[in-house]
Amino acid sequence: MIVGVLALQGGVEEHLTALEALGATTRKVRVPKDLDGLEGIVIPGGESTVLDKLARTFDVVEPLANLIRDGLPVFATCAGLIYLAKHLDNPARGQQTLAVVDVVVRRNAFGAQRESFDTTVDVSFDGATFPGVQASFIRAPIVTAFGPTVEAIAALNGGEVVGVRQGNIIALSFHPEETGDYRIHQAWLDLVRKHAELAI
């Protein structure tokens, strides 16, 4: 089983470290041919506007969006959540997204870099609960609205939705890969394996 990490910018190495620690075979994805044969892909955090521009530069937008629409499992963190969203509350000028997850997302919902913080978050999906996931929020977004096919899987004490699931897509506002808490990576890899088995 090969899983990719979209390696255009951001926290690429941290996700590769997490996935490889869990026994996954990984591949960096920069151009369309890198998508061939993948059974899942991670879209890391970083800067969502830069991610958008580089994805267009490397012509990876349409092939990636098509694979996701066809059911490719995705794990996205922070800017990755923004990049998947159908709508943004506060897009940068000219900013585009893959528009594959039926959510409205607010960028930088907690303020600038100096307002970044670490906390713990309970995450629940597929009948499993992962209590106290160690989470870094770095210029993090929140989900302000979501459609009927989307499930909220994580929220802060104030009610802010910081994790969603839509089908084979898990998207978080925060960075578990930065903290060494790989439980959500493992749960996503389990989802990838189930999807691969169903495809046989």
UniProtKB/Swiss-Prot annotation:
InterPro entries: Class_I_gatase-like, PdxT/SNO, PdxT/SNO_CS. It catalyses: aldehydo-D-ribose 5-phosphate + D-glyceraldehyde 3-phosphate + L-glutamine = pyridoxal 5'-phosphate + L-glutamate + phosphate + 3 H2O + H(+); L-glutamine + H2O = L-glutamate + NH4(+). SUPFAM superfamilies: Class I glutamine amidotransferase-like. One of its GO terms (biological process) is glutamine catabolic process. Signal peptide: none annotated. The active site is at residues 78, 175, 177. Keywords: Glutamine amidotransferase, Hydrolase, Lyase, Pyridoxal phosphate. The keyword Hydrolase applies. The keyword Electron transport does not apply. PANTHER family: PYRIDOXAL 5'-PHOSPHATE SYNTHASE SUBUNIT SNO, PYRIDOXAL 5'-PHOSPHATE SYNTHASE SUBUNIT SNO1-RELATED. Catalyzes the hydrolysis of glutamine to glutamate and ammonia as part of the biosynthesis of pyridoxal 5'-phosphate. The resulting ammonia molecule is channeled to the active site of PdxS. This is Pyridoxal 5'-phosphate synthase subunit PdxT. It comes from Corynebacterium glutamicum (strain ATCC 13032 / DSM 20300 / JCM 1318 / BCRC 11384 / CCUG 27702 / LMG 3730 / NBRC 12168 / NCIMB 10025 / NRRL B-2784 / 534). The gene is pdxT.
